[in-house]
Regions:
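Bacterial N-terminal signal peptides that target proteins for export
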Residues: 1-11
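Sec-dependent N-terminal signal peptides
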Residues: 12-18
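Aromatic sugar-binding interfaces of carbohydrate-active proteins
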Residues: 25, 340-356, 363
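Short, low-hydrophobicity acidic/polar segments
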Residues: 28-237, 300, 316, 323-325, ...
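Surface-exposed loop/edge segments in extracytoplasmic proteins
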Residues: 92-102, 250-258, 332-345
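Short helix-loop boundary/capping segments
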Residues: 197-204, 212, 217-308, 318-319
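Extended, compositionally biased non-globular segments
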Residues: 297-350
Length: 392
């Protein structure tokens, strides 16, 4: 695969958490205090909403912040959740210090061991998930640590092509301890895209990390419901929902490597810190991914939309195939038909305006309705084996 040109997201959304971070020996052990405790906040760009051919885009709703603060212009704070951020503290001419920021949803910790204060350049990615590794250099040459002040190249290996996780890279960092006021609104001066400089200082409570992230994947939001008249006759229980992507008729491979070139700027203009991204397929297995995510139990669909999110590698993708597996019951609870399977092919430029291929940082919303082909002249087979149709 070749290069994917970077795109500038239309809007920005924030991910904000403020929790004490202490260094520890590993992700699985209790944290032990290091000489330089760290506290973390982060924001991530909002998805650009793909405009449907027949109606306007919706705004993305964010969850509330856990503390009052004045966000950078154009950003909105959301909750911390469960995240693991792969991080590299770098200095020109030095080996990078690699570690993680990780949260269980209520507190943050770090594996970074920072014993000497100083000026660093902070790079990273999220989420760090099982089986994924990452290396860094200051140029395309491996093991080049000469000029992190100018940017970096992250190579994130073995990423799933379709995943429940929002895959992002760090595009800006700052030490903001001068801006923080406990239990009060505060602003973050100088937090800018393309500025990776971060100062580690001595003194308890002074290392507050502010991080900016940007998406390198696209997002797919699927809304499913049952036709109202049909819902009076049958109950639909959704068991599986998964997506497969393809580019120019070639199905995307299951795993890939992402090489992301970042350039440092002073943040004074609209230059995108993501210079380019190369996605390289790994292995020969064709990919598909479950959209249902962490839901282990089947879902009874109703006439109200059930919503599911997934993320996928966007390079060259012009078609998505959604497959749903469900059981059909009568209104007495008797199983009528098991493991019905329906596949729907989404041709991008037929459903979304002026888009022949998916773009990173863009979210695509698809509405699906389960209904029989001819509701008012039903054969028994049609009643018990309904189709799934796009209703965008």
């Amino acid at each position: 695969m070749g290069l994917m040109e970077p795109m500038r997201p239309m809007g920005l959304i924030g991910l904000m958490s403020l929790i004490g971070l202490m260094g520890c020996t590993s992700e699985d052990t209790e944290p032990t205090e290091k000489l330089t405790p760290i506290e973390l906040m982060g924001v991530v760009t909002q998805y650009e909403e793909a405009t449907e051919a027949t109606r306007a885009a919706r705004a993305y709703e964010a969850n509330g912040a856990t503390r009052a603060w004045t966000t950078p212009s154009g950003y909105t704070a959301i909750g911390a959740g469960n995240h693991t951020i792969g991080a590299f503290l770098t200095q020109n001419g030095q080996e990078p210090n690699e570690g993680f920021f990780y949260s269980n949803g209520s507190s943050w910790h770090t594996t970074l061991d920072i014993e000497t204060p100083g000026n660093f350049y902070l790079y990273g990615y999220m989420p760090h998930i099982s089986g994924v590794t990452c290396t860094i250099s200051s140029s395309a040459a491996a093991n080049d640590n000469s000029s992190y002040s100018s940017g970096a190249v992250l190579t994130i290996r073995n990423l799933p092509a379709v995943t429940a996780n929002d895959v992002c890279v760090l595009v800006g960092a700052k030490n903001g301890w001068n801006d923080y006021k406990d239990n009060a609104d505060y602003s973050i001066t100088g937090l800018r895209r393309g500025d990776f400089a971060y100062e580690v200082v001595t003194g308890e409570g002074k290392n507050k990390v502010f991080l900016l992230f940007d998406h390198i994947y696209s997002a797919l939001r699927v809304r499913m419901k049952v036709d109202g008249d049909y819902n009076n006759l049958r109950t639909i229980v959704l068991k599986e929902l998964y997506v497969q992507t393809s580019a120019s008729g070639i199905v995307t491979k299951k795993r890939l490597d992402a090489t992301v070139t970042l350039r440092a700027t002073d943040g004074s203009d609209d230059t995108d810190p993501i210079s380019n991204i190369v996605f390289t397929p790994v292995g020969t297995d064709e990919g598909d991914g479950t959209i249902l995510g962490a839901l282990n139990d089947p879902v009874t669909l109703t006439t109200v939309d059930s919503e599911y999110m997934s993320h996928f590698m966007p390079q060259g993708v012009d078609k998505l195939i959604l497959t749903s597996v469900y059981n059909v019951y009568d209104k007495k609870g008797n199983l009528v038909r098991e493991n019905c399977k329906a596949s729907n092919t989404l041709i991008l430029n037929q459903l979304f305006s002026e888009q022949d291929q998916t773009r990173r940082g863009c979210r695509y919303t698809v509405n699906l309705t389960i209904m029989p082909t001819y509701l008012y002249s039903l054969s028994e087979a049609d009643l018990d084996n309904p189709t799934v149709t796009f209703t965008n």
